């Protein structure tokens, strides 16, 4: 059964720019999918459709059986409870510690403090920051900040982890460390969709690769690769 279905999707902005044109993608539960393409190719727009940051101009986007394109704004929070989202720029709150940043994602659930602590510490340990749970973001490296971002995204055990250029600001060694964490999360059953420019990661992990070029899905390969001439 497919956890995500994108059917005949078009996205055109008010300025007349067409970001996506007739996109069709099916993603089964437990998959790991890289979405690649050059800058302004439309790959980030496709990612944003999945968590309803954007709405399609035409077509349908199903996530967990729900057509998110028709979801009313007041219902979007229910969709995002099922998702974990990791951004390129971390989006951490600088005045909160590692623990507090991760716990912040659970505030809306009204969970008992004991359960919150258990979930938060488990997520922090999974990303390898157990010894730094009291540290503030300014005292962490870029890679450590991204680990916090991942912990926050997975603290409520989402069915889907959406990563939009999660290694874009990191050096190659740190990027591989972050990718190892994301891959392990996938191996534990979480579906992962990751937009990336990182050729080395794509070529090393040999996952399914979807290529977007000028708003068009031009290739979709199992165990694909990132080839420079193919990207252009």
Positions of predicted regions on the chain:
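Short coil-to-helix segment of the ABC ATPase nucleotide-binding domain corresponding to the Q-loop/switch region
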Residues: 96-104
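Conserved ABC transporter NBD signature motif
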Residues: 59-67, 79
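A short, proline-enriched helix->beta-strand linker immediately N-terminal to the Walker B motif
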Residues: 155-159
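Helix N-cap at the start of a conserved alpha-helix in ABC-type nucleotide-binding domains
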Residues: 172-174
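Catalytic Walker B motif of ABC-type/P-loop ATPase nucleotide-binding domains
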Residues: 161-164
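Helix-to-loop junction immediately C-terminal to a conserved catalytic motif
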Residues: 51
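Conserved ABC ATPase signature
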Residues: 136-140, 144
């Amino acid at each position: 059964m497919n956890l995500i279905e994108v059917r005949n999707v078009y996205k055109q902005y008010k300025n007349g720019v067409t970001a996506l044109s007739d996109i069709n993608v099916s993603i089964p539960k437990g998959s790991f999918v890289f979405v690649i393409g050059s800058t302004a190719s439309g790959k980030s727009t496709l990612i944003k459709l999945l968590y309803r940051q954007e709405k399609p101009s035409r077509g349908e986007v199903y996530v967990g059986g729900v057509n998110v394109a028709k979801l009313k704004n007041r219902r979007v929070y229910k969709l995002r409870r099922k998702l974990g989202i990791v951004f390129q720029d971390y989006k951490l709150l600088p005045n909160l510690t590692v623990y507090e940043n991760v716990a912040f994602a659970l505030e809306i659930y009204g969970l008992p403090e004991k359960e919150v602590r258990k979930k938060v510490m488990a997520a922090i340990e999974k990303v390898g920051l157990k010894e730094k749970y009291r540290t503030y973001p300014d005292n962490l490296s870029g890679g450590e900040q991204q680990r916090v971002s991942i912990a926050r995204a997975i603290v409520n055990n989402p069915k889907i982890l959406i990563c939009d250029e999660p290694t874009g600001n990191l050096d190659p060694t740190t990027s591989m460390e972050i990718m190892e964490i994301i891959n392990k999360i996938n191996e534990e059953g979480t579906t992962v969709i990751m937009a990336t420019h990182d050729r080395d990661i794509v070529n090393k992990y040999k996952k399914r690769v979807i290529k977007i070029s000028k708003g068009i899905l031009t290739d979709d390969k199992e165990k694909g690769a990132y080839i420079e001439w193919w990207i252009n």
